[in-house]
């Protein structure tokens, strides 16, 4: 049976997994994301045997060149995805991390022709399949709705430099300063905010009320843009706090939606979500990626 290497380049961690054609995980590896994360994880998996490799990476990226460009949350704002893997002499496919994640859900789990994926982690990202077609855009960044403006009067600056972006309010890297702004104390890390809210600390509860409304406003934009039947939500902030996010998000969406909503479910593969999606890209490469010359 063929085996596929999936690499997940995140802002904090870079992961690699080896899967078979059914999506079963055979091996795992994880390192801190460095200035050249694909080259660094390639050294770790040098002894693994695989037939093709996929990479799901934080963006934005230039799919034509296979390079991440101007990434706001990583140690290096620009780094190659394809070049460090050529030494393996295996087909290589790359895409944005959330594009990989939604493709993994499509191939290995749900097979829904209209679905979207949202990650809530260090940053915010989106991937979408519409009428069975994986959306990419001219450079591979059709899904960068973390940079959709949800408050055009806000002075809050996103890591990319823009004002009022979805990610500037709900992304993990921005939550401490947002908490400080709303609560008048802190800053606090996301895990501490949720912990204190569960303990009933008033300022944390009041902050999450604002944060969840910002989340719902951004999700309403995703649903309006892609009209999915199913929205998958992943990333550490969402999955570690699904008791709150999963309960509150559908309720708060109602006031922002002018279109029919979508079923909302947590990501199927936990921390492996993007890496499994990357392996799925290598296993069943979507037609839209083939137009960019993948596999290479």
Swiss-Prot record:
<keyword id="KW-0119">Carbohydrate metabolism</keyword>
<dbReference type="GO" id="GO:0004340">
    <property type="term" value="F:glucokinase activity"/>
</dbReference>
<dbReference type="GO" id="GO:0008761">
    <property type="term" value="F:UDP-N-acetylglucosamine 2-epimerase activity"/>
</dbReference>
<keyword id="KW-0067">ATP-binding</keyword>
<keyword id="KW-0460">Magnesium</keyword>
<keyword id="KW-0313">Glucose metabolism</keyword>
<keyword id="KW-0808">Transferase</keyword>
<dbReference type="InterPro" id="IPR000600">
    <property type="entry name" value="ROK"/>
</dbReference>
<dbReference type="Pfam" id="PF00480">
    <property type="entry name" value="ROK"/>
</dbReference>
<dbReference type="GO" id="GO:0006006">
    <property type="term" value="P:glucose metabolic process"/>
</dbReference>
<comment type="function">
    <text>Catalyzes the phosphorylation of D-glucose to D-glucose 6-phosphate using ATP as the phosphate donor. Has a broad hexose specificity, and in addition to glucose, which shows the highest catalytic efficiency, it can also phosphorylate fructose, mannose, galactose and sorbitol. Can also use CTP, GTP or UTP as phosphoryl donor.</text>
</comment>
<dbReference type="InterPro" id="IPR043129">
    <property type="entry name" value="ATPase_NBD"/>
</dbReference>
<dbReference type="GO" id="GO:0009384">
    <property type="term" value="F:N-acylmannosamine kinase activity"/>
</dbReference>
<comment type="similarity">
    <text>Belongs to the ROK (NagC/XylR) family.</text>
</comment>
<keyword id="KW-0418">Kinase</keyword>
<dbReference type="InterPro" id="IPR054671">
    <property type="entry name" value="GK_pyrobaculum-type"/>
</dbReference>
<dbReference type="GO" id="GO:0005524">
    <property type="term" value="F:ATP binding"/>
</dbReference>
<keyword id="KW-0547">Nucleotide-binding</keyword>
<protein>
    <recommendedName>
        <fullName>Glucokinase</fullName>
        <ecNumber>2.7.1.2</ecNumber>
    </recommendedName>
</protein>
<comment type="subunit">
    <text>Homodimer.</text>
</comment>
């Amino acid at each position: 049976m063929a085996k596929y290497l999936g690499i997940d380049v995140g802002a904090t961690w870079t992961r690699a997994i080896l899967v078979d054609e059914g999506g079963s995980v055979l091996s795992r590896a994880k390192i801190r994301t460095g200035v050249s994360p694909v080259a660094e994880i390639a050294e770790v998996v040098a002894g693994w045997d695989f037939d093709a490799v996929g990479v799901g990476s934080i963006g934005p990226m230039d799919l034509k060149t296979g390079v991440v460009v101007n990434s706001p949350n990583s140690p290096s704002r620009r780094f190659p995805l394809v070049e460090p893997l050529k030494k393996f002499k295996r087909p290589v496919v790359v895409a944005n991390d959330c594009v990989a994640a939604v493709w993994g859900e499509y191939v290995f789990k749900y097979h829904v022709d209209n679905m979207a994926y949202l990650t809530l982690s260090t940053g915010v990202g989106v991937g979408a399949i519409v009428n069975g077609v994986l959306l990419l855009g001219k450079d591979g960044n059709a899904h960068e709705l973390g940079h959709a403006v949800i408050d055009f009067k806000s002075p809050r600056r996103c890591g990319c430099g823009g004002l009022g972006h979805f990610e500037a309010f709900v992304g993990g890297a921005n939550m401490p300063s947002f908490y400080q702004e709303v609560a008048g104390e802190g800053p606090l890390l996301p895990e501490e905010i949720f912990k204190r809210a569960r303990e009933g600390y008033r300022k944390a509860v009041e902050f999450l009320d604002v944060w969840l409304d910002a989340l719902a406003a951004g999700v309403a934009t995703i649903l309006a843009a892609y009209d999915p039947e199913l929205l998958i939500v992943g990333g550490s902030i969402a999955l570690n706090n699904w008791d709150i996010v999963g309960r509150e998000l559908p309720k708060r969406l109602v006031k922002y939606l002018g279109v029919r909503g979508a079923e909302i479910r947590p990501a199927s593969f936990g921390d492996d979500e993007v890496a499994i999606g990357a392996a799925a890209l290598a296993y069943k490469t979507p037609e839209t990626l083939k137009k960019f010359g993948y596999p290479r």
